[in-house]
C-alpha cells in the first residue's frame, strides 16, 4: 500500500521543466488582453512620438537661438516694435554692485563716495572733544552730546549759540560740517578740520578766510547765501538732487536719490540699465534687448578701441581715432570740475555743460597767461583750452574714474603717452639733480590753491 501511494504521488507532481514550459505558453487571446490593459500614455508608440516632438522642439528652439545670436532673427527693434521699458528712475549704487564689483570696490574707497555723509562717529574726522577755536574775537567750541556733534559759534544774529552738525563734507585734505536750519537751509560752517597728518601741518581746526574778519552780516558768513549748501554745493556732492525751493515761503525742500556722489551721478538714472542687464541673462532670445546704449542715459565709451602711438622723433603721442565733436566724458566730469553757475536743473550726463550752466571763460585773475589755473576754477575751463584736449585726451586717460585717482602715480601718468627718453631728462626739465625731484606737474600743473 505504501509503495502504491508513493507511485501515485510521483505521477501527479509536475516536473520543474514542465511547469516552466506551461508558464511560458500564454494563449494569443490572453496576450491581447494584457496589451489592452497598458495605459495609452505608457505605450511604445506614444512614447516614441513624444520623444520625437521633444527632439524637434529642442532643435527648433536651439536653431532660433543660434539664428538670433547670428543676427538673422528679426528682433522687435528690427520690426519697428518698441519694447516696453521701465520709466527712468534712480536705483542707487548698491543695485550696480552685483555686476560691477571691481568698480564698486574702487568707488567705496574714493572721495566721491565720501563727498557727503551723515554725521556719525565713523564719518566725523574733527576733534569734538570739547575743542575750541578762536577767530577775530569769536570763541567757538566743538563738543558731543548724546552721540551727536555740536558746535557753539556765532549764529545769523552774531550771538553765540549751539548748532548740531547734521552732515560731513569731504574727507581729504579737509572736512567741512553742515548745519541744518528749520527752513530747510543747510549751511556750511566756515571753520573746517584739516585732515592731513599732524607732521604735514594737519589735525587742527582752521578758518577758510583766515585773513578776513567775516562778521554775521557779511555775505561770506557761514549762515548766509554764499555758504548755502542747497544753492552752492548740493549738485556736486550728492546724486539726483532736487533743490525744491519754495519762493513763496522762502524755504527749501531739497532731496536727493543718494547722499554722496554715486554711480548715477555720472552714468545717469539706472533703472533701464538694470532692466537691460536682467534681459540679457534670459535664455529666450526674444527677451534680449539690442539697445546700443544698454539702457544707460549716456554710454561713456570714448576710450574703447583707442590707442596712443608715440612719434619716436618728437616723443609726442597721436590718437589712433579722431575725437568726437562732443566729449561726453569731459562734459560729464565738467559738471562738478568747472567754475560755473547753474541756470537750469535739466542737465543730464553727457550733455553739453553750457546747455544748463554758465562756464567761467578766460577772465583776468582766474587763469595764468598760459591758460593754467590761477584762482579756484577747477579743471574744466583750463583743460578745454589746452593742447591735450585738442589732441583728443579725455579725463579717464589720466584718471581712473571709479577710484578718482591717477592711473599711474607721479610722472608715470604722463609717461603713458610721452616718451621718457625725450621728456624725463634734464635737457627738457632744466632741473638736473634737484631734490626733491621736479615732476612734470611741478611746471605744467602747479598747485596754488
Feature annotation, model-predicted:
Residues 1-37:
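N-terminal intrinsically disordered, acidic low-complexity segments at the extreme N-terminus
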Residues 50-63:
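Hydrophobic membrane-insertion alpha-helices, especially the h-region
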Residues 4, 71-80, 84-87, 102-170, ...:
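Primarily the internal scaffold of c-type cytochrome electron-transfer domains
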Residues 200-201, 232-238:
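Long, basic N-terminal domains or extensions that often function
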Residues 60-74:
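Hydrophobic single-pass membrane-insertion segments
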Residues 224-226:
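Exposed beta-sheet edge/beta-hairpin loop segments within beta-rich domains
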Residues 36-50:
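Short, low-complexity patches enriched in S/T/P/G
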Amino acid at each position: 500500500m505504501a509503495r502504491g501511494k508513493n507511485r501515485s504521488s510521483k505521477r501527479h507532481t509536475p516536473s520543474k521543466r514542465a511547469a516552466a514550459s506551461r508558464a511560458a505558453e500564454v494563449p494569443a487571446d490572453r496576450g491581447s488582453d494584457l496589451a489592452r490593459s497598458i495605459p495609452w500614455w505608457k505605450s511604445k508608440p506614444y512614447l516614441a512620438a513624444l520623444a520625437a516632438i521633444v527632439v524637434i522642439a529642442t532643435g527648433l528652439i536651439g536653431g532660433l537661438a543660434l539664428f538670433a545670436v547670428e543676427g538673422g532673427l528679426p528682433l522687435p527693434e528690427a520690426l519697428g516694435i518698441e519694447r516696453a521699458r521701465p520709466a527712468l528712475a534712480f536705483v542707487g549704487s548698491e543695485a550696480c554692485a552685483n555686476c560691477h564689483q571691481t568698480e564698486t570696490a574702487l568707488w567705496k574707497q574714493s572721495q566721491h563716495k565720501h563727498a557727503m555723509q551723515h554725521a556719525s562717529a565713523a564719518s566725523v574726522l574733527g576733534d569734538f572733544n570739547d575743542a575750541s577755536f578762536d577767530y577775530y574775537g569769536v570763541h567757538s567750541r566743538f563738543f558731543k552730546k548724546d552721540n551727536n556733534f555740536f558746535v557753539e559759534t556765532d549764529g545769523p544774529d552774531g550771538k553765540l549759540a549751539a548748532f548740531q552738525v547734521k552732515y560731513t563734507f569731504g574727507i581729504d585734505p579737509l572736512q567741512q560740517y553742515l548745519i541744518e536750519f528749520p527752513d530747510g537751509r543747510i549751511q556750511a560752517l566756515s571753520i573746517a578740520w584739516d585732515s592731513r597728518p599732524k607732521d604735514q601741518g594737519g589735525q587742527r581746526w582752521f578758518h577758510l578766510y583766515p585773513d578776513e574778519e567775516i562778521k554775521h552780516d557779511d555775505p561770506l558768513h557761514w549762515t548766509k547765501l554764499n555758504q548755502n549748501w542747497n544753492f552752492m554745493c548740493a549738485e556736486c556732492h550728492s546724486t539726483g538732487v532736487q533743490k525744491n525751493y519754495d519762493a513763496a515761503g522762502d524755504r527749501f525742500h531739497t532731496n536727493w536719490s543718494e547722499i554722496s556722489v554715486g554711480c548715477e551721478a555720472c552714468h545717469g538714472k539706472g533703472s533701464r540699465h538694470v532692466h537691460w542687464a536682467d534681459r540679457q541673462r534670459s535664455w529666450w532670445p526674444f527677451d534680449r534687448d539690442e539697445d546700443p546704449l544698454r539702457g544707460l542715459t549716456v554710454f561713456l565709451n570714448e576710450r574703447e578701441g583707442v590707442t596712443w602711438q608715440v612719434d619716436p622723433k618728437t616723443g609726442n603721442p597721436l590718437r589712433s581715432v579722431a575725437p568726437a565733436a562732443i566729449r561726453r566724458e569731459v562734459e560729464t566730469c565738467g559738471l562738478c570740475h568747472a567754475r560755473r553757475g547753474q541756470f537750469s536743473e535739466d542737465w543730464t550726463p553727457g550733455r553739453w555743460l553750457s546747455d544748463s550752466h554758465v562756464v567761467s571763460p578766460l577772465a583776468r585773475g582766474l587763469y595764468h597767461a598760459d591758460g593754467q589755473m590761477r584762482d579756484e576754477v577747477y579743471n574744466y575751463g583750463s583743460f578745454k583750452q589746452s593742447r591735450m584736449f585738442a589732441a583728443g585726451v579725455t579725463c579717464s586717460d589720466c584718471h581712473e574714474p571709479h577710484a578718482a585717482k591717477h592711473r599711474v602715480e607721479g610722472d608715470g601718468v604722463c609717461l603713458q603717452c610721452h616718451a621718457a627718453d625725450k621728456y624725463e631728462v634734464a635737457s627738457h626739465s632744466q632741473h638736473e639733480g634737484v631734490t626733491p625731484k621736479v615732476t612734470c606737474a611741478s611746471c605744467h600743473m602747479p598747485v596754488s590753491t
